[in-house]
Structure formats: C-alpha cells, structure tokens
C-alpha cells in the first residue's frame, strides 16, 4: 500500500478525497493535515457535506508542518496556501497532486486529467495539478470522440 496524506481537512475536495481513499486497493490514507485552527480536531468534527456515506476512518488533524512518512500528498488547500506548502513538500521528495490553481500555469508542473492521459506525468518532477473543474465535462467526452473517430 502507498502511504498518503491529504492537505486540507474540512472542505468538499478534502471530503471527496477521504471518501475515495477509504477502501482504495493501492492507497492507504494515514494523515490529514489542516490549518492551525483545526489542528487537534478530528475529521468527524466537521459536517459531512457529500451525498454519500462518511468514511469510517476518523483522523486527528495534524499541522501542515507535520506531514511526513508518506509517498503521496493529495492537496485540497486553498490556492494561496497551496502555493507555499505544495512546493515545499515536493522539494522534500513527496509526490504532490494538487486541486488548487496555484501551479496550473507553471512550467514543469503538468495539468492532468488521469482518465484521459495518465502518461502525461511521466518524465516530470513529483508535482502535478488537476485542471479546472469546468474543463472536465467537456474534455473527457471530446477525448473519447477523438479516440474512436
């Protein structure tokens, strides 16, 4: 299992990642880190806002400074905070996958839609980001059409 952490503790993106990782066959979520005012709280302390069941795992929120001993970091941080922390963690050797817009136009940080092209990450450093969410509903069907045209 690949040990993972989530940056961001209570928002919709963080909750979605928590849900997706709970029973994943490859990834083991071992840490959720958040803002200083949330450090020490449990993930169960936050209102669950998604339309599916809350994960059974309950994590004590750690400081962003304490993220360690993981191979992959899934970031759900606001862009201004992500700009600082994602770069720092990537420089420390962690593989960072971001949902923030901070690095979407930075050379050497690929924007990926894994459903379309997971090979886009090959040859890059250990930092990648997701596209803007409005792109996905258009890009994936267009990709499927081009692949089967």
Give, region by region, the residue ranges found by the protein language model.
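N-terminal Rossmann-like NAD(P) cofactor-binding subdomain of oxidoreductases
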Residues: 1-149
